A protein has these predicted regions:
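Catalytic cores of nucleotide-sugar-dependent glycosyltransferases that transfer UDP/GDP/TDP-activated
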Residues: 1-475
Length: 475
């Protein structure tokens, strides 16, 4: 099967968030499973020079951008047995950051149109074009309007994946005239609430639509989660499905991870205790093996559940024998709160400002319990990494958390969960974990089940292959 995977970022070339992790892992797994999956991304100025040195020039052409044509250079490279294509235009992409520019709508309208224009030049006729988030949402729109009836482009199916429905590519209608270039007779495809909405256009015109977890696919049909797109998604519910993301189980492997204080496995967990002791020492926490250590690695923003933590952590620290560490940065109100808590509970609570990947791995491996009380969570990777390292997650049953963490009350459980977005419910779930850790044998079995959880990309990739095959049957 021939798949063109379109994304605005992909590791190791360019990345600013979770999409880069997905685009850097899923296509490679698909290739290992025998699929011809190729990736296309912008040629950003931020791509490291050593990676640019591996690129080869193919050709250049012009791309329609509303009423004008813009230069497009096309490059390719091989990386980890996958073919990458790079769309080049220095005016659009040679900038210090990937996003946040005044002309992002124009930049990614150009990118979306260039993806379709490049296909004859690379002599690659994909069976499926897989688009991701609003930055490539115009690809199925442009295909439907301008390319589907051209002989070379016949019978190409499209899949549009929503990684976070909050970011929809919503702009005023002047953007259509200057950047997007949809005929006036067809603007209803992109219209929502009087504005131009790129994600809405993709939902309407793509062959299929997916999200990054089954529960999130169900949730975004509800007004509470949809950010206004529930009517569109309910109208086209038949094309919507959810596939849970995976993690790189080769990188996140407690048996071989060189960044851990000591390696361990599900069959020999003795090294995990040393990871905890060394982490406590590094963070100036009391070195007590018998005191449960609760960890968080997160952005400090409200939708990650930080308002619940702010309401309930002080009471937990006062009434329970526990330690707490959090690594992250974000809203100042939460940063100030954790600085206050660190001063109030010296030796028991540590706030590590910023994000240090090496320290994050040490928290995943050294903590006993991992807290993730999100208000919304399309998929989430942190809970799956914690499971991989045998650190028991306490999560709210929402989105991908609900699909990957199952309460220990069930025989197959691998963590502790709560449903309502309430401080008392979160506190009870944490207390249940603190009570559970006192049962050494039961906790060891829970850790074993956690480490046995299959959150690999192999499983997710097979689900995507099944979805691709099903999509090819659609008219």
């Amino acid at each position: 099967m021939r798949i063109l995977y379109c994304a605005s970022e992909a590791n190791p070339f360019c990345g600013s968030g979770g999409l880069a992790d997905v685009a850097g892992s899923l296509p490679h797994t698909l290739c290992r499973k025998g699929q011809d999956c190729r990736i296309v991304v912008p040629l950003y100025g931020t791509i490291p020079q050593e990676l640019k040195n591996s690129m080869n020039f193919i050709t250049n052409f012009t791309v329609p951008v509303a009423w004008r044509h813009q230069y497009c250079g096309l490059f390719w490279a091989r990386w980890n047995d996958c073919t990458y294509y790079f769309i080049d235009n220095e005016y659009y992409f040679k900038r210090g950051t990937l996003y946040g520019h005044y002309d992002d709508a124009e930049r990614f309208a150009f990118f979306s149109r260039a993806i379709l224009e490049m296909l004859p030049y690379i002599d690659f006729h994909p069976d499926i074009i897989h688009c991701n988030d609003w930055q490539t949402a115009l690809v199925p729109v442009y295909y439907y309007l301008f390319y589907s009836h051209r002989p070379w482009y016949y019978n190409i199916k499209s899949l549009f994946t929503i990684h976070n429905i909050q970011y929809q590519g919503e702009y005023g209608w002047e953007v259509n005239t200057e950047c997007v270039g949809i005929p006036a007779s067809e603007t209803k495809i992109l219209e929502m609430n009087g504005k131009l909405n790129m994600m809405k256009g993709a939902i309407e015109t793509a062959t299929r639509v997916s999200t990054v977890s089954p529960s999130y696919a169900a949730e975004i049909k509800d007004p509470w989660f949809s950010w206004g797109l529930h009517d569109e998604l309910n109208l086209r519910h038949y094309k919507l499905c959810g596939i849970k993301n995976g993690i790189d189980t080769e990188s996140y492997n407690p048996e071989t991870d060189y960044q851990l204080y000591r390696n361990y496995s599900k069959d020999d967990m003795s090294g995990k205790g040393e990871c905890k002791r060394a982490l406590q020492e590094r963070l100036c926490l009391e070195q007590r093996w018998d005191v449960p250590l609760v960890g968080m690695v997160t952005r400090l923003v409200a939708h990650k559940g930080l308002d619940l933590v702010r309401m309930g952590l002080e009471e937990l620290m006062d009434t329970e024998n526990m330690q707490f560490v959090i690594l992250g940065s974000g809203d100042k109100e939460f940063e100030d709160y954790f600085n206050y808590m660190q001063a109030k509970y010296p030796g028991r609570l540590c706030f590590c400002h910023g994000f240090v990947p090496e320290l994050a791995r040490k928290i995943y491996s050294g903590a006993d319990i991992f807290l993730m009380p999100s208000a919304q969570e399309p998929c989430g990777l942190a809970q799956m990494i914690a499971l991989r390292y045998g650190t028991i997650p306490v999560v709210r049953e929402v989105g991908g958390l609900k699909d990957s963490v199952f309460d220990s009350a069930d025989n197959y459980g691998n963590g502790f969960t709560f449903k309502n977005y309430e401080c008392a419910d979160m506190q009870l779930a944490v207390r249940r974990a603190l009570w559970g850790i006192q049962d050494d044998q039961g906790w060891h079995q829970l850790m074993w089940r956690a480490m046995m959880s299959d959150n690999s990309w192999d499983r997710s990739a097979q689900d995507y292959i099944n979805l691709y095959n099903d999509t090819l049957k659609w008219a």
